[in-house]
Design a protein with these regions (language model features):
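Amphipathic/hydrophobic helical signal segments and adjacent flexible N-terminal regions
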Residues: 4, 24-82
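Bacterial N-terminal signal peptides
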Residues: 8-19
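A short, hydrophobic/aromatic-rich structural module that often spans a beta strand
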Residues: 25-30, 134-148, 188-196
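Edge beta-strand at a domain terminus
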Residues: 64-69, 157-168, 172-196
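Mid-length scaffold segments of soluble, non-membrane domains
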Residues: 78-141
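An anionic, turn-rich surface loop/hairpin at beta-sheet edges
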Residues: 96-106, 141-167
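Short, solvent-exposed aromatic-acidic interface loops
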Residues: 122-129, 145-150, 180-187
Length: 196
């Protein structure tokens, strides 16, 4: 008879620990992420290092300075950050054919539908739309879709031509970025920088 309360307490403790674990926080992503994107993210560090080497070996001095400024900050905690609202955003392509290209600023928006943040790049010829998932206190995972011009966004999981995956890092009070390893087009690493 005395074992019953002990079992209940053990069960409740296990349930609490499971709910608090990072795996529980990112459980939803495991049912969504494609195998190809899982592999891209698994190779993120190596891809980023190679792309950074190529970027620093090419591109204009101004673009190299911009690249270093964007990737240099240590990631900050997302816990006290409200991402919702309007943002300026620009793409930086590192590694690959052109080695380094920094594009101009466009408009992005982040909304919160109650189940999490959703990003949409509103202007420019190459756009993205997707959701964020907690990976750690200082890193979010982004899963989204790519569209050109005014084409509609296909749902995530439609295939490697349009699926996108990356890691988001906060760099300041109103400054963050998403790094996309091994994008489908043109580069080894795409960075979407966002400021307001």
């Amino acid at each position: 008879m005395s074992r019953f309360p002990g079992l209940v307490l053990a069960f409740l403790a296990a349930a609490f620990l499971a709910a608090a674990s990072p795996a529980a926080a990112t459980g939803e992503i495991e049912s969504l992420i494609t195998d190809a994107d899982r592999e891209r993210l698994a190779n993120y560090e190596t891809t980023r290092e190679r792309a950074s080497e190529e970027a620093r070996a090419g591109g204009s001095p101004q673009d190299r300075a911009t690249f270093d400024q964007v990737v240099a900050p240590e990631p900050m905690s997302w816990s006290d950050f409200d991402m919702t609202g309007e943002w300026q955003c620009r793409t930086i392509k590192a590694g690959g054919l052109a080695q380094l290209v920094v594009y101009g600023w466009f408009k992005c928006r982040v909304t919160d539908d109650g189940s999490g943040w959703t990003l949409e790049k509103l202007t420019g010829s190459q756009r993205t739309k997707g959701r964020f998932f907690t990976d750690s206190d200082t890193r979010l995972t982004y899963l989204g879709s790519y569209a050109v011009n005014d084409d509609p966004f296909p749902p995530y999981g439609s295939g490697p031509e349009t699926d996108q995956a990356g890691y988001a890092f906060r760099a300041g009070a109103n400054w963050w970025r998403i790094e996309f390893p091994s994008p489908k087009r043109e580069s080894k690493l795409d960075i979407l920088e966002l400021k307001r």
